[in-house]
Regions:
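Short, charged low-complexity linear segments at domain edges
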Residues: 1-27
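A generic local structural motif
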Residues: 14-17, 66-69, 124-128
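Canonical Radical SAM [4Fe-4S] cluster-binding loop centered on the CxxxCxxC motif
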Residues: 18-64
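Flexible, charged surface loops at secondary-structure boundaries
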Residues: 21-24, 72-76, 132-133
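Conserved beta-strand positions in the central sheet of alpha/beta enzyme cores
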Residues: 29, 44, 81, 139, ...
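Short, basic/glycine-rich phosphate-binding loops at helix/coil junctions
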Residues: 43-50, 76-80, 146-150
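Short Fe-S-cluster ligation motifs
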Residues: 64-85
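Conserved AdoMet/S-adenosylmethionine-binding subsite of the radical SAM
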Residues: 89-215
Length: 215
């Protein structure tokens, strides 16, 4: 699925959900890529072919994604979320082009992106500026309270420097994106949650604790 939404603790094609609930406003999620530069211990990507969001035919082209938008019942959209079953910044050029298309074609919608925040390391340059005027919210996975724990969980291919780079990216995003949040899941324990809160205080970042969903 390219465009999907939530349904019964799982996922469903956006247009199919609209057929079931034609009067509802729904968040539209964009499944952009299955690639990632992390290999998180908790990641649902390990399910691969057993998961609805695994792109079995490979990554959809930018034109195919645009056409999916043009064919979708946009009158039922609440917000647009660039998320899916991989790290969206792995297709950075296409991502910026897609966000530009959304901004120009559907200017009334708020757009959020979920990311691991490692695009500066992936491309060897500052990347937050590329999202200026294109995102209303960026949600960045903090995961843990220090670099060692972060690397143990994310198994980032960039090693121990990943944690600081992610935090620096989050701070940089505040210069270009109205709403910047970092997230952790609620299963990491109270002590770790409190430690993450202290990190966010140090970096002046907004923390959101989200429920872990294994679906």
């Amino acid at each position: 699925m390219i465009l999907y939404t939530l349904h019964n603790n799982g996922y469903i094609d956006f247009s199919e959900k609209v057929k079931l609930f034609p009067k509802e406003k729904l968040n539209m999620y964009v499944n952009f890529t299955n690639r990632c530069n992390c290999n998180c211990t908790f990641c649902l990507r390990h399910l691969k072919d057993d998961h609805k969001l695994w792109l079995k035919d490979g990554e959809p082209s930018l034109e195919k994604i645009k056409q999916a938008f043009l064919n979708a019942p946009m009158e039922n959209v609440a917000d647009i979320v660039i998320c899916g079953f991989g790290e969206p910044t792995m297709r950075l050029d296409d991502l910026v082009k897609l966000l530009t298309f959304i901004h120009q074609t559907y200017p009334k919608f708020k757009v959020r992106m979920n990311t691991n925040g490692l695009s500066d390391l992936e491309y060897g340059k500052k990347t937050a500026v590329l999202f200026k005027g294109l995102l209303n919210t960026i949600s960045i996975s903090l995961n843990e309270s220090n670099a060692d724990k972060y690397l143990e969980v994310t198994r980032s291919r960039f090693g121990i420097k990943s944690y600081k780079a992610m935090l620096d990216f989050a701070v940089d995003c505040k210069n270009y994106i109205p709403n910047v949040v970092v997230t952790i899941v609620d299963i990491i324990g109270e002590d770790e949650i409190n430690a993450c809160k202290k990190v966010c205080e140090e970096y002046n970042l907004n923390l959101r604790i989200r429920r872990y969903e294994a679906n």
